[in-house]
């Protein structure tokens, strides 16, 4: 076995694709296994910004979605070919955006083939060009180091038994698979070899054939009927399947079947559903075959958790678990006692033996009702509290939605705008939420924009540090191009009915604050953003449909998925009364102010801010900067790369471009040394009575980069009134960073590594590279305070 290539596709540091080459057993052929990073499959079917070229805007895709792929060189045709081809990666209901019921109803069409999801490990059976059968697991062949017998070995033994039962040979099967150019896909279920969640003993052991895939990059697979016929001809175990015509019929059946986790009186893990799709992320396929799965949540979620905590216990680690807390704690106590009495049980368990018998022994001794146990522990012990977390910008209607729900169900609304700003604000917000939980409320609305990624994850961290069992429900408001103008008009019509944004203090000020939020906004992206990955539920809302309809969406989602939280089904009159309360009766009484105490001398200007006048700006800026149009910066970058004969994807793909671009003129951290210059900026803003402080033009002189950050170095137009009144020795535009851990201000350190004489430059660091920008490129932006 040799490890070969590692390829990055979506700009991440870790490899998207890795390859390992194996010597095929009893053959002269080498087969290369291609393993794709699991998160990349999720990215590939998402609209994450990582899936789009930052310069051209074209969609970036994986070369194939195959999960389980082996290639080899065919000496006869003198070309590389796919020898083993697994399924395209498919997802559970609600696991990714394209497998929500709403999405499936739009991009899939029937008939829907349901196949029972057998509970084992996947085995691939294919043929080498020389007519030999090859059997593999998902990513390996033959003997695996550290194992006395591998999955592929056991799979091949079962294959021989199945073929013998119908008087067939491996050579005959190889000939048939070569003729079809297909891979047979089966589930190895054998408790004598390895236990999983469901039992497979006696005559139920063997290879369950559930797929025949064409050996090509696109996903082309045989129907369940063809697979069943093939299984019968070649002696495999058959997988039960049946059809449903509509998505609505399918959904009703699956939700009913999940109540007891059985089908035809047999406990099963769930179903795999096969259909056809026209989703845009699958456009590269010539086929439109599409799979998704419906795994019964109970009791198998609890069984999987028990398996994991048991292995932690045996390994000497402290068992960590988030659901079914009460019964899992009892199960761990039982296992601890059992293993102290029987050391062999530990050894067998780590070899995946005795898993089911240990679990069954605990259930019998505890005399527990299995389905009632798992459901009640999930809802009561696992997630006792529910927090609604909007992801929005100003004016989307989140407070109105919150107040409608408060009126309907008594769910308290914790408003960040009702809490003092300043240091420790996020923790105060979290503590206020926890206080409501401790006061006996099971649902709380976290009324804050949560528009920045780390705000969303920090909120979870701060709350879970103080209280267990919180279910986090994300409420992302759509942020389409027409939303900013729509919500801006809504805010202006609202007037002064807000704790901190008062239209009477100036329309320009309101627009400036809103623009700052737009620039900071990071879309909710559980597939591509680690800060968003741990939310339990997602309910998409839309500012354009109105707050009442958004409130109905939340209620309808809860009725379907968390019905115990909806004590009564509101009538139309109830909704109308709640809307009237939220819009007409509720009036914010708290006045949130920023900056210095307004009792100080009227219109006093200090290095901290401007106070006293209602039309001035009481909150001290973080910095003053020139805000630049994103498209202008990107087109300038394209121009520079074109002249240098460089391609972004080839030379700079490791960097992720910034969401917005600016040139920092002076930062609040520079006030102690440069207070006089800071006060000049404040005075200018005060005199103009607006945050729009005038346009400034710059010349882009160099493109500079190292392994962490890439930026433009710029110089200011000498005719500007601000020329010479900046505190950055090298003005610049940070273009991108190599990871989310790298901060944009590192451009300052990067430029310090170069020796500058006017526009002439000399590198003192071999890791720093640069391009001189010629001919001249001029870029212009608006000087504004940034809060």
Curated annotation (Swiss-Prot):
Assigned EC number? 6.5.1.3
Q: Which residues form a coiled coil?
A: none
Q: List the disulfide bonds.
A: none
Q: Name one GO cellular component term.
A: cytosol
Q: Which InterPro entries match?
A: P-loop_NTPase (IPR027417), T4-Rnl1-like_N (IPR019039), Trl1_fun (IPR012387), tRNA_lig_kin_fungi (IPR015966), tRNA_lig_PDEase (IPR015965)
Molecular function GO terms recorded: 2',3'-cyclic-nucleotide 3'-phosphodiesterase activity; ATP binding; GTP-dependent polyribonucleotide 5'-hydroxyl-kinase activity; RNA ligase (ATP) activity
Catalytic activity annotated for this protein? ATP + (ribonucleotide)n-3'-hydroxyl + 5'-phospho-(ribonucleotide)m = (ribonucleotide)n+m + AMP + diphosphate
Q: Which GO terms describe its biological process?
A: tRNA splicing, via endonucleolytic cleavage and ligation
Where does the record say this protein resides? Answer: Cytoplasm
Q: Where is the active site?
A: 117
Q: Which Pfam families does this one have?
A: RNA_lig_T4_1, tRNA_lig_CPD, tRNA_lig_kinase
Q: Which UniProt keywords apply?
A: Cytoplasm, Ligase, tRNA processing
What does the protein in this record do?
A: Required for the splicing of precursor tRNA molecules containing introns. The ligation activity requires three enzymatic activities: phosphorylation of the 5' terminus of the 3' half-tRNA in the presence of ATP, opening of the 2'3'-cyclic phosphodiester bond of the 5' half-tRNA leaving a 2'-phosphomonoester and ligation of the two tRNA halves in an ATP-dependent reaction.
PANTHER family, per the entry: TRNA LIGASE
What is the UniProt domain comment for this protein?
Has three domain each corresponding to an enzymatic activity, namely in N- to C-terminal order: ligase, kinase and cyclic phosphodiesterase (CPDase).
Family the UniProt entry places it in:
Belongs to the TRL1 family.
Provide the protein name: tRNA ligase 1
What is the organism field in this record? Answer: Schizosaccharomyces pombe (strain 972 / ATCC 24843) (Fission yeast)
């Amino acid at each position: 076995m040799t490890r070969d290539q590692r390829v990055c596709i979506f700009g991440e540091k870790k490899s998207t694709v890795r390859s390992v080459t194996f010597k095929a057993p009893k053959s002269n052929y080498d087969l290369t296994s291609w393993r794709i990073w699991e998160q990349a499959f999720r990215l590939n079917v998402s609209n994450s910004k990582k899936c789009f070229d930052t310069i051209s805007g074209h969609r970036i895709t994986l070369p194939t979605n195959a999960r389980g792929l082996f290639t080899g060189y065919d000496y006869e045709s003198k070309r590389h070919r796919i020898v083993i081809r697994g399924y395209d990666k498919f997802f559970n209901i609600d696991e990714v955006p394209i497998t929500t019921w709403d999405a499936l109803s739009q991009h899939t069409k029937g008939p829907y083939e349901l196949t029972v999801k057998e509970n084992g490990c996947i085995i691939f059976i294919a043929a080498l060009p020389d007519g030999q059968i090859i059997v593999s697991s998902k990513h390996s062949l033959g003997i695996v180091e550290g194992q006395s017998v591998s999955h592929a070995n056991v799979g091949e033994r079962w294959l021989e038994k199945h073929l013998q039962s119908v008087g067939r040979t491996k050579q005959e099967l190889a000939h048939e698979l070569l003729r079809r150019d297909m891979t047979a896909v089966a589930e190895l279920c054998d408790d004598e070899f390895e236990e999983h969640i469901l039992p497979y003993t006696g005559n139920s052991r063997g290879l369950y054939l559930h797929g025949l895939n064409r050996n090509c990059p696109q996903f082309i697979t045989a129907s369940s009927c063809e697979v069943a016929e093939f299984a019968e001809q070649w002696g495999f175990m058959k997988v039960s399947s049946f059809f449903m015509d509509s998505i609505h019929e399918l959904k009703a059946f699956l939700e009913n079947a999940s109540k007891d986790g059985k089908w035809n009186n047999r406990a099963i893990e769930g179903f795999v559903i096969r259909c056809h799709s026209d989703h845009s992320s699958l456009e590269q396929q010539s086929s439109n075959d599409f799979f998704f799965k419906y795994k019964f949540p109970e009791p198998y979620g609890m069984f999987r958790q028990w398996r994991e905590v048991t292995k932690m216990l045996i390994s000497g680690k402290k068992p960590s678990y988030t659901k079914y807390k009460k019964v899992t704690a009892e199960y761990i106590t039982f296992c601890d006692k059992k293993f102290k009495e029987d050391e062999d049980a530990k050894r067998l368990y780590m070899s995946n033996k005795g898993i089911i018998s240990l679990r069954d022994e605990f259930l019998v001794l505890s005399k527990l009702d299995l389905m009632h146990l798992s459901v009640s522990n999930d809802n009561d012990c696992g997630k006792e509290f529910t927090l609604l977390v909007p992801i929005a910008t100003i004016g989307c209607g989140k407070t109105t939605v919150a107040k409608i729900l408060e009126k309907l169900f008594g769910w308290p609304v914790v408003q960040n705008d009702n809490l003092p700003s300043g240091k420790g604000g996020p923790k105060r917000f979290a503590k206020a939420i926890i206080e409501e939980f401790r006061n006996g409320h099971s649902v709380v609305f976290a009324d804050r924009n949560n528009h920045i990624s780390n705000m969303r994850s920090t909120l979870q961290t701060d709350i879970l540090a103080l209280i267990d069992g919180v279910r986090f429900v994300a409420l992302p408001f759509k942020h389409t191009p027409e939303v900013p103008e729509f919500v801006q008009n809504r805010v202006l019509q609202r007037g002064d009915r807000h704790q901190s944004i008062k239209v009477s203090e100036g329309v320009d000020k309101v627009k400036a604050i809103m623009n700052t939020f737009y620039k900071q906004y990071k879309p909710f992206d559980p597939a591509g953003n680690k800060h968003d990955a741990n939310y339990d539920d997602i309910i998409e809302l839309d500012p354009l449909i109105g707050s009442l309809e958004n409130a109905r969406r939340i209620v309808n989602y809860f009725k379907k998925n968390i019905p115990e939280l909806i004590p009564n089904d509101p009538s139309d009159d109830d909704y109308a009364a709640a809307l009237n309360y939220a819009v007409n009766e509720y009036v914010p009484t708290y006045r949130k102010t920023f900056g210095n105490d307004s009792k100080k001398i009227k219109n006093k200007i200090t290095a901290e801010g401007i106070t006293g006048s209602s039309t001035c700006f009481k909150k001290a800026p973080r910095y003053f900067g020139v805000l630049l149009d994103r498209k202008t910066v990107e087109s300038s970058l394209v121009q520079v790369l074109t002249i240098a004969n460089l391609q972004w994807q080839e030379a700079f793909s490791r960097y992720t471009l910034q969401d917005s671009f600016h040139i920092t003129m002076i930062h609040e951290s520079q006030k102690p040394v440069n207070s006089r210059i800071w006060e000049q900026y404040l005075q200018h803003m005060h005199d103009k009575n607006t945050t729009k402080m005038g346009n400034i033009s710059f010349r882009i002189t160099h493109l500079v980069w190292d392994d962490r950050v890439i930026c433009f170095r710029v110089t200011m137009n000498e005719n500007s009134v601000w020329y010479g009144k900046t505190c950055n020795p090298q003005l610049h535009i940070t273009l991108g960073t190599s990871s989310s851990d790298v901060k944009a201000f590192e451009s300052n350190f990067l430029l310090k590594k170069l020796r500058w004489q006017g526009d002439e430059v000399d590198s003192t660091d071999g890791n720093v590279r640069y391009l001189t920008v010629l001919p001249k490129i001029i870029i212009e932006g608006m000087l504004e305070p940034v809060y």
